[in-house]
């Protein structure tokens, strides 16, 4: 298995699909990486030479992926909560952020129902 950005990439999959195993790289970005490195999208990882895998590593290193991306996202959420803005308050209360209704729905975000005490 090839190791890119600290992740073991599946050998038997096509390059585009295998790159999506990295957190922060979706299908579109994987296609852009393949185009930039001039590697065929339908080539399997096990068919690539070591030099081609090195170019993939260099291209992926240009993007924020994996742990750095996770850390950046959590820091952005923490910043919103510290600011006390509307989105930060909604994060703090575990409610939907983007204007969805909460009277009847939003069970995933709010968690299981709590019984009403008498």
Swiss-Prot record:
InterPro entries attached to this UniProt entry: Rbsml_uS13_C (IPR027437), Ribosomal_uS13 (IPR001892), Ribosomal_uS13-like_H2TH (IPR010979), Ribosomal_uS13_bac-type (IPR019980), Ribosomal_uS13_CS (IPR018269)
One GO MF term attached to the UniProt entry: tRNA binding
Keyword Transmembrane: no
A cellular-component GO term for this protein: cytosol
One record GO biological process: translation
Keywords of this entry: Ribonucleoprotein, Ribosomal protein, RNA-binding, rRNA-binding, tRNA-binding
Top-rank taxon, per record: Bacteria
Gene3D superfamilies assigned to the protein according to its UniProt record, in alphabetical order: 1.10.8.50, 30s ribosomal protein s13, domain 2
Subunit structure of this chain's protein: Part of the 30S ribosomal subunit. Forms a loose heterodimer with protein S19. Forms two bridges to the 50S subunit in the 70S ribosome.
Family affiliation: Belongs to the universal ribosomal protein uS13 family.
Protein name according to UniProt: Small ribosomal subunit protein uS13
Species per Swiss-Prot/TrEMBL record: Shewanella loihica (strain ATCC BAA-1088 / PV-4)
């Amino acid at each position: 298995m090839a190791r890119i950005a600290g992740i073991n990439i599946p050998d038997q999959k096509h390059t585009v699909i295998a790159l999506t195993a990295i957190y922060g790289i979706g299908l579109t970005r994987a296609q852009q990486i393949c185009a930039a490195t001039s590697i065929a999208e339908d080539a399997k990882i096990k068919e690539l030479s070591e030099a081609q895998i090195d170019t993939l590593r260099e291209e992926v290193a240009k993007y924020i992926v994996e742990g750095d991306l996770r850390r950046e996202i959590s820091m952005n959420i923490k910043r919103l909560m510290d600011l006390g803005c509307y989105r930060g308050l909604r994060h703090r209360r575990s409610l939907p952020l983007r204007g969805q209704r909460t009277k009847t729905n939003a069970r995933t975000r709010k968690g299981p129902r709590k019984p009403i005490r008498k």
